[in-house]
Amino acid sequence: MRTLLWMMAVFGCVAAVAKQGSDTSLSDAAAHYVSPEDLLGKPPADNWISYNGDYSGRRYTALNEINTGNVGRLNAQWVFHTDNSRNLEVTPVVFKGLMFVTAANDAYALDAHTGREVWHHARPISEGLIDDASRHINRGVALWQNRVYMETDNAHLLCLDARSGNLVWDVAYADWKKNYGATSAPLVVKDKVLVGTSGGDDGVRGFVAAYDARTGQLAWRFWTIPAPGEPGSASWPGNSYLHGGGTTWMPGTYDPELNMIYWGTSNPSPDFEGTVRAGDDLYTDCVLALDPDSGRLKWFFQFTPHDLFDYDGVETPLLIDTEFKGANRKLLVQANRNGYLYILDRTNGQFLFAAPFVDKLNWAKGIDAHGRPIRTDVKPTPGGMRVCPGYSGATNWFAPSYNEATRLVYFMALEQCETYFSKPTPESFKESREYYSTGVKQIPGEPSQKILIAFDIKKGSAAWKYPQVGSGHSSAGTMTSAGGVVFFGDDAHSFEAVDAATGKPLWHFNTGQPISASPMSYGVAGKQYVAIAAGSDVFSFALP
């Protein structure tokens, strides 16, 4: 029986468990620094070095051993079970044969070839959290040199030694007692670790913060809700800005050439109730372009001004360089929760295009020439109003992808409407309590349906659609490959592969568990693997 080496860290009851007899090559690989060149590399191949694979957010792998002609022969290679998570939302990160995954507040290093545990950093889940934070969600890690970074449910940023899992430092970057939490994977840019928070439904004031990757010292913080006297503060009378929402609960993307970070923000607070926050409610439901060195705002674009429907704008901002309307452009593409796909010039935030991608859409008639929605009279009422898309949105945080060969964007859409209710008197903010001013109900007899959409940004419409069978409640995202395949978790617990050009189904594997995560791909010793989390397990697949 193998001996376990327990090493207690100085911050709370935390342990790193290292498995003796680890493969020497893995130890050597983990000791190698993740260099700036590694972080800048794109598209990913053997290494899937960050949540989205690379800075662009495109989730496109250059590996092509697995392709449309042989993907039907994929077999499960290994399954790793985590101990403390009911439903993983993590995307594994792989560097030189070592895989890093998270579950609640735990981090694991695995042999990416065999699934064998190399080390385990254990941390108890936090008590007393509310809303999203109380679900103890963790979506993954970031890498830099020989360090691993993760957020915890109570908004701490941890720095771990990649070789052992031992704690290097621990920084509390928000106060959980004031309703803050964290669910995201961090993003490393240069020598800074960028983090965001959850709690936008609970009356927190959102921000993006950057910490020194070496020391954990705060470098800068950008508040997404402006204080009195700052640009955009007119929406927030008195002290309402302190509880205005606009959280940053998914990682952003980064353009090294422009030196700009792109980060999405969530809905305003109180949720569904606009009388106490008249105006556009900046900078909620936005994509922000920030300077990674200073945190200075370069530009912003707001998708849903004065949001009454919980249409967060945190969906991944895809960075795509391609011809658009006769010119080569640096584009930012986002399929938004409000039901529209947007295309912006990411150099300056100029609005270029928007189109609906769901049929069930009644809150707006369209998008005007400046990118603002043309609103209808639909809004929450005391008696209830049918609103489309519903509370879960026409899409959500589940990852989109972009294939460089097909030039199509792939994402999961949801056809759904719900009944929204408002309260005659808005509630006041209180700590340790959700800050909702309404509720939503499903509409009896009106089912929801998930659909995988391939969107042609040049034509401005869907190239194909692949309807799902299931409840409509899954949160699985996509990944695409140079082999011409789109991988995704479907709404009926299966990991699927379809032809990226046509949507033709090619392969599926029933995991027997809900899939609430997005897939990735990596290579070890010349062999390509694809992996996805389902339930409490991580599955890895390869050709025979």
Name each model feature, range by range.
Residues 316-358, 362-363, 379-390, 395, ...:
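Phosphate/diphosphate-binding loops
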